[in-house]
Design a protein with these regions (language model features):
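Short, charged/polar "capping" segments at the starts of alpha-helices
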Residues: 34-37, 107-108, 155
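A structural signal for isolated positions on well-ordered beta-strands in alpha/beta enzyme cores
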Residues: 2-4, 27, 98, 146, ...
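NAD(P)+-binding Rossmann beta1-loop-alpha1 motif at the extreme N-terminus of oxidoreductases
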Residues: 1-51
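Short, well-ordered alpha-helices that flank and scaffold nucleotide-derived cofactor binding pockets
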Residues: 17, 21, 85-89, 112, ...
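Rossmann-like NAD(P)(H) cofactor-binding subdomain of soluble oxidoreductases
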Residues: 52-135
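NAD(P)-dependent Rossmann-like dehydrogenase/reductase catalytic/cofactor-binding core
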Residues: 217-308
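Generic preference for hydrophobic
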Residues: 28, 58-60, 147
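Internal alpha-helical scaffold of NAD(P)-dependent oxidoreductase catalytic cores
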Residues: 89-90, 113-118, 133-185, 190-237
């Protein structure tokens, strides 16, 4: 199975690098600057699960020569439109597109560009970042990749992808309910991003503040109410451990959006918070804390000066 990994940053570079190390047929679609860096230094991963150093196969949008069996989209949500244009030469009638973007807005964009049949569901969980040398540094132990057909079927193509993903150096799982899994991740991520960005603190900082745990619980309840109103109510197996994780005393947990905000970097405010707020309004769900978080992030985006 020929895989095209769109992006070789901390997410695409990590999972794609592990797949390449496991001798899977992996090519990375990258911009010229990242391509030049990878040609000079190779793709390097620094990880508690073992370091990786390899010479990756690379293409740019201008040099894609033929369709791929599967395309894994790992770009930030605000880069999706450009990525969909870039991958077009690599999409054939049987190509499967597996996005691991945050939120759910990207689903409609992919279907509009390439049709419902091209889309499969996906999500990943990893804490990683690029260092000043362009190496991918894994910041914690977890490295999970979940995928499945949006209708829950066990198609031939998804089983082929599962065979490629298994035993590739990370935790891989074929899901029979990937759409709910994607919503569950969105609920967790929206709450984590919203509360850490609003307070400029870790989960432990918030939990230790007067009223902090109650604030997080109310924020999470708003998010869950929106998901439930759209037919994606989570079960207790998600709710109970997630509530505990989000209110843990002493936790150093933060969100990637918070880390981006503190670095004056672009953020996925519209896709993670704004879209959820809009869906709440559509369903007549009252979400004052979500609204406060979105106003806060919108002001940051307005005032932000791009890094030079």
């Amino acid at each position: 199975m020929r895989l095209l990994i769109v992006g070789a940053g901390s997410t695409g570079g990590y999972f794609g690098g592990r797949l390449a190390q496991a001798d899977r047929d992996v090519t990375f679609l990258v911009r010229k600057g990242r391509a030049d860096q990878l040609k000079a230094t190779g793709l390097q991963i620094v990880s508690p699960h073992g370091d990786v150093a390899l010479t990756p196969k690379l293409v740019t949008a201008e040099t894609i020569a033929s369709p791929y069996d599967a395309i894994i989209l790992t770009v930030k949500a605000y880069s999706l439109d450009a990525a969909l244009k870039d991958i077009a030469p690599g999409v054939g009638p049987k190509t499967m597109i597996v996005p691991v973007l945050n939120g759910m807005r990207h689903v409609d964009s992919i279907v509009a560009a390439f049709g419902q049949d091209a889309l499969a569901g996906g999500l990943c969980s990893i804490a990683a970042a690029l260092d000043d040398q362009g190496r991918i540094v894994q910041l914690s132990q977890f490295h999970n990749f979940v995928y499945g057909e949006m209708n829950g079927s066990r198609s031939e193509r998804i089983e082929q992808l599962d065979a490629v993903m298994q035993n590739a150096g990370f935790d891989a799982r074929l899901s029979s309910n990937i759409e709910q899994d994607m919503w569950n991740k969105w609920m967790f991520l929206a709450t984590l991003a919203g509360v850490t960005c609003l307070t400029r603190g870790t989960i432990g900082d918030i939990a230790g503040a007067p009223g902090g745990a109650d604030f997080v619980a109310r924020f999470f309840d708003e998010v869950v109410s929106v998901a439930s109103a759209h037919g994606h109510a989570p079960g207790a197996s998600f709710l109970d451990p997630t509530r505990a994780l989000l209110t843990e005393q002493g936790s150093t947990l933060t969100s990637s959006m918070y880390r981006d905000l503190m670095k004056n970097s672009p953020i996925e405010a519209d896709q993670i918070i704004g879209d959820l707020l809009a869906r709440g309004k559509q369903a007549h769900v009252d979400t004052p804390l979500l609204a406060a978080a979105y106003v806060n992030l919108a002001i940051y985006q307005t005032l932000r000066r791009p890094n030079t």
